[in-house]
Structures are given as C-alpha cells and as structure tokens.
Amino acid sequence: MHSHDETPPFRFCPVCGSPLEPRVLKITEPKRLVCTNASCGFVFYLDPKIAVGTIIRIGERGRIVLVKRAIEPGYGKWVFPGGYVDRGEEITLAALREAREEAGLDVRLDHLINIYSYPGRAPVIIVYAATMISGELAVDDEGLEAREFDLDEIPWDDLAFRSTREALRDYIDGKVTAPAK
C-alpha cells in the first residue's frame, strides 16, 4: 500500500510548463504526476530522500558519539551524526562528510549496519558503523552538544528518531548487513 495521495508538491511540468496532474499509470504503483499536455507526456517521479548516518566508535572502550540536535525535528534530542545525501554524491562520501560536519571527526567506515525506511516517511536512512581516525569532537550549527557515551549510557528515552533507536540496537546486537565499500 502506498501513501502518496497527498497534495502534489509540484504543479507544472519542468519540460513544457503545462499543469501536472496525479494519474494511475499502473495499477500496482502509486499515482504519478503526469503532464496534461498530450504531446509532452512527461512523468514526474517523486523519489525518496536518502539520508546517511554513522555510529562512530571512539577508543578502546568502544564509546560512541551522539549529537544533541539544535534543529527540528527532534530539537534537544540525541542522534548519531548524519544527514541528507546531496544529488550526485556517493553514499559513503556523504557519510564521511556528515561525520566531519556534525561531530568534527574523520572516520573510517567499517560496515553497513542496515537501511531503514518507514511507510509514509520520505527519507530512507543508510547507517554505517565507523571508527574515529582523527579530529576533535565538536558540533556545527545543527548541534547543541556532541558527546561520547558508553553503550550502557545511551539516553534511550531522549533519542530523536525511531531509526536512531533501531540502528543503535542493531549496532549493539552486532547486526551487520555488509562491509562498507
């Protein structure tokens, strides 16, 4: 079941400028935005947003890094460093970039923990386990605080997102989907 029956975010065809309208093209797929100009027929596919995250291990004790968010959604709640992948950016490079931007750390990606997606939610979240190789723990303008936590100190009741909780549990349980490429 698809939940794409909201008001379309785009109203005009990017090719010819004619209005777009939602239409069912295949019974097994959600409605697509289609150009009303029959000679154009452009189909606008609304792709999901892709986000990456890194659960960063620091030191021999295996402490992990969490960042307290300074933005909504989840203001004041804890997450691992992460964010959106830019168009054309490699997933692994986005994960490295986000670790540097949000926590001030250069990391080595060790393995893919999992990919998280939820019905009716736009982002698909790709989460890696990583090890700090250099840098000083710091936050950017999207964070209030960055901190190291022992695994038994994780503030479970103050985590920002379902994907944060699920990825941390998978990390602690040792679930590994694949080596990082």
Predicted regions and their residues:
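A broadly conserved sequence feature marking short terminus-proximal activation segments
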Residues: M1-F12, T54, D170-T177, K181
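NUDIX/MutT-family hydrolases
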Residues: V139-L168
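Active-site-adjacent beta-strand/loop module that shapes the phosphate/pyrophosphate-binding cleft
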Residues: Y116-L137, R147, A167, I172-K175
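Conserved Nudix-box catalytic region and its N-terminal flanking loop in Nudix hydrolases
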Residues: H2-S3, I58-E101
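Conserved hydrophobic "DFG−1" position in protein kinase catalytic cores
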Residues: I56-R57, L66, A130, E148
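A short coil-to-beta-strand element that immediately follows conserved catalytic motifs
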Residues: V24, D106-I113
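Acidic, metal-coordinating catalytic segment for phosphate/diphosphate chemistry
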Residues: D5-T54
